[in-house]
Amino acid sequence: MTSFVIDPTWAEPLHSLRDTPVNNVVVDSREIHAGVVWDLRSESVELGDGQTVRREFVAHTGAVSVLALDDDDRVLLIRQYRHPVGMMLWEPVAGLLDVADESPRAGAARELVEEAGLVADEWHTLVDFETSPGGSSETIRMYLARQLSAAPGGRPVGSGEERDLPLVWMPLDQLVDKVLAGEFTCPTTVTGALAALAHRNQGWRSLRPETAAWPARNHVVDSGRSRQQV
């Protein structure tokens, strides 16, 4: 049996490990491009060991996504065109946190109405993640929405890529199988499906409240890495 040597620098108990915000000194920050949805920045940052490096990244507003689960353990999926990858992707409800003074939970509820014409009486935090932390400040919170019903007025008519979005209900187990087979590759679909499976396997006891702390999001906003909301 192979024996691995543990670096003593990281020999603290595994249960204590977590991702933590840091405040490295930003020596210089430049806006390379101001886009319609997000911006591109170039920053010089001190690493704390005498090194200064320059990094470019997308300054993103952040986003929310909703894994809507009905009483038959089926997940709502919407098919949408995503131009940067040139693909039609099956994904949960999602949207940008681009409305000033709107909480993530309120934004998620708004997106659920706008994209699916649904409201939910039960909300939990499903999972938090950063989509591409090496090149983007985007943070995403996924909610689990249950006890679903039709929104007053039904499903609104969207525009652009959001016009006439096909919608299906897929059993969670089938969704997980498709994720593992590489048939679904959208990050919210992959992350949401696997997180929902893990929570279900624990009897949903591991779900966090809808108002759970979101330290990564708070740090990105407070440190000025997020694109300003309007």
Give the label of every model feature segment.
Residues 2-21, 125, 133-136, 160-230:
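Nudix hydrolase/Nudix homology domain
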Residues 4-10, 65-110, 152, 159-161, ...:
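Conserved Nudix-box catalytic region and its N-terminal flanking loop in Nudix hydrolases
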Residues 12-36:
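A short, N-terminal "cap"/entry segment at the start of jelly-roll beta-barrel domains
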Residues 25, 119-126:
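A short coil-to-beta-strand element that immediately follows conserved catalytic motifs
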Residues 28-32, 127-132:
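Short, solvent-exposed loop/turn elements at beta->coil junctions and helix N-caps
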Residues 28-67, 71-72:
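Acidic, metal-coordinating catalytic segment for phosphate/diphosphate chemistry
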Residues 40-44, 67, 77, 142-144, ...:
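Conserved hydrophobic/aromatic beta-strand scaffold that supports enzyme active sites
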Residues 44-49, 132-152:
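Active-site-adjacent beta-strand/loop module that shapes the phosphate/pyrophosphate-binding cleft
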